[in-house]
Curated annotation (Swiss-Prot):
GO terms for biological process: glycine decarboxylation via glycine cleavage system; nucleoside metabolic process. PANTHER family: GLYCINE CLEAVAGE SYSTEM P-PROTEIN, GLYCINE DEHYDROGENASE (DECARBOXYLATING). InterPro entries: GcvPA (IPR023010), GDC-P_N (IPR049315), GDC_P (IPR020581), PyrdxlP-dep_Trfase (IPR015424), PyrdxlP-dep_Trfase_major (IPR015421), PyrdxlP-dep_Trfase_small (IPR015422). The keyword Oxidoreductase applies. The glycine cleavage system catalyzes the degradation of glycine. The P protein binds the alpha-amino group of glycine through its pyridoxal phosphate cofactor; CO(2) is released and the remaining methylamine moiety is then transferred to the lipoamide cofactor of the H protein. CDD domains: GDC-P (cd00613). HAMAP family: GcvPA (MF_00712). One of its GO terms (molecular function) is glycine dehydrogenase (decarboxylating) activity. It comes from Bacillus cereus (strain ATCC 14579 / DSM 31 / CCUG 7414 / JCM 2152 / NBRC 15305 / NCIMB 9373 / NCTC 2599 / NRRL B-3711). This is Probable glycine dehydrogenase (decarboxylating) subunit 1. Belongs to the GcvP family. N-terminal subunit subfamily. Its EC number is 1.4.4.2.
């Protein structure tokens, strides 16, 4: 057999060409000058059999540092967490895996209910009233929150803490430029937002203040103090939060946050180069009609049975593009499903235990670093990340660790000149005592 897969036969081609009124495929490219058309055969190797191809690809993949063979202490927004086995089984079912936006509720009840459950669990974690069906990732969720605030308050200035993830701030800058909004960064002090600087910057021109909880350095921000400053001028208070941390920390909603956003990656979504992720967006009832993205609501059908539908669709671009609250289109439904299944499998106590283990193992790692003579830069409370002064380029340290099958922490000098030679170390529930001890000992040996 010459070709294993036949996308179309010669008869199919002939019928398609006749339908559009041409005789040959070459006629489709008649607008391209002959002088620039490629002639001859491409220098492509001969086709391989499936076993040969699988062997070659496996050999190529074996060159990658994967988390089955390497202990990872790299976080900075993407974390190596446990995902219950059932997650992959459920999201691989064809009715979920291939489904698109469920515009027809009569044939999409399974997907709609799954999204509704995701929204419900996000509300429970964040302490907010309503959540959407997901965003692309935490960065776009943050930017969309700022756009909502600017539109609601009709103000042009956005204050964002420098302790917010640098990549999320970059996405915010991109959104703001197109809307002619001014983004002002509030410096951090001792690893958290400088409240004195924040107090001096908040005035009646500020649409919102954005902080991260825990922040990019792993530190837990003082949300109660920040909220008082923000709401003095009737600005909106936006908090970006790691949802897993909310299994242990007081939810932002309890501190008066107006919008809580973040990335659901810690729940069932693996680490992978470039994503995809799953942003979440939760807010109070006051902003329910301004929230971006899909919203699934619970209702009853003509027989009085419980059902689920897309609701408040007039906000969306497929209804009124020029009046839409956002131009975000397809949500991350499959990843939201993964997060839902992971949270459901863990249960409330499981999420709490997972968060507790992150805290306890990170605290153990901190103590071991200090015992080895390292300086842990910030003294405040943290969740599962903290900053270590390496006294030498972090890249050199990480290159050495990689030889020991360890993926080291994030090089803060990439984004903060004042934190050159500082490493952001992440310790999740998957890290063992032996792995933590090995990390500290290896770093101590090259200090």
């Amino acid at each position: 057999m010459l070709h294993r897969y036949l996308p179309m036969t010669e008869e199919d081609k002939k019928e398609m060409l006749q339908t559009i009124g041409v005789q040959t495929i070459d006629e489709l490219f008649s607008d391209i000058p002959e002088s620039v058309r490629f002639k001859g055969d491409l220098k492509i190797k001969e086709a391989k059999s499936e076993p040969e191809l699988l062997k070659e690809l496996s050999q190529m993949a074996s060159k990658n540092a994967n988390l089955k063979e390497y202990a990872s202490f790299l976080g900075a927004g993407v974390y190596d967490h446990y995902a219950p086995v059932i997650v992959d089984h459920v999201i691989s079912r064809s009715e979920f895996y291939t489904a698109y936006t469920p515009y027809q509720p009569e044939i999409s009840q399974g997907e709609l209910q799954a999204i509704f459950e995701f929204q419900t669990m996000i509300c429970e974690l964040t302490g907010m009233d309503v959540a959407n069906s997901s965003m692309y990732d935490g960065g776009t969720a943050l930017a969309e929150a700022a756009m909502l605030a600017a539109g609601h308050t009709r103000k042009k200035k956005i204050l964002v803490s420098s302790a917010v993830h640098p990549e999320s701030r970059a996405v915010l800058e991109t959104y703001a430029k197109g809307q002619n909004l001014e983004v002002v960064e509030i410096n951090h002090k001792d690893g958290v937002t400088d409240l004195d600087v924040l107090q001096s910057e908040v005035d009646d021109t500020v649409a919102c203040v954005i902080v991260q909880y825990p922040n990019f350095f792993g530190q837990v921000e003082k949300l109660a103090d920040i909220e008082k400053i923000v709401h003095q001028q009737k600005s909106l208070f936006i908090v970006s939060s790691n949802p897993l941390s909310l299994g242990a920390l007081t939810p932002p909603g309890k501190f008066g946050a107006d919008i809580v956003i973040g990335d659901a990656q810690p729940f069932g979504i693996p680490t992978q180069f470039g994503g995809p992720h799953c942003g979440y967006f939760a807010t109070t009832k006051a902003f329910m009609r301004k929230i971006p993205g899909r919203l699934v609501g619970q209702t009853v059908d003509s027989d009085g049975k419980r059902g689920f539908v897309l609701t408040l669709q007039a906000r969306e671009q497929h209804i009124r593009r020029d009046k839409a609250t956002s131009n975000i289109c397809s949500n991350q439904a499959l990843n939201a499903l993964a997060a839902s299944v992971a949270m459901t499998a863990l249960g409330k106590q499981g999420v709490k235990e997972m968060a507790r283990q992150n805290i306890s193992k990170a605290q153990y790692a901190k103590r071991q670093f200090e015992a080895k003579g390292f300086t842990v830069t910030f003294a405040g409370p943290f969740f599962n990340e903290f900053v270590v002064d390496c006294k030498r380029p972090v890249k050199e340290v990480n290159d050495a660790l990689l030889q020991k099958n360890i993926i080291g922490g994030y090089d803060l000098g990439r984004d903060y000149k004042e934190h050159e030679n500082h490493m952001l170390v992440a310790v999740t529930e998957l890290r063992t005592k032996e792995e933590i001890d090995t990390l500290v000992n290896e770093m101590g040996a090259i200090q």
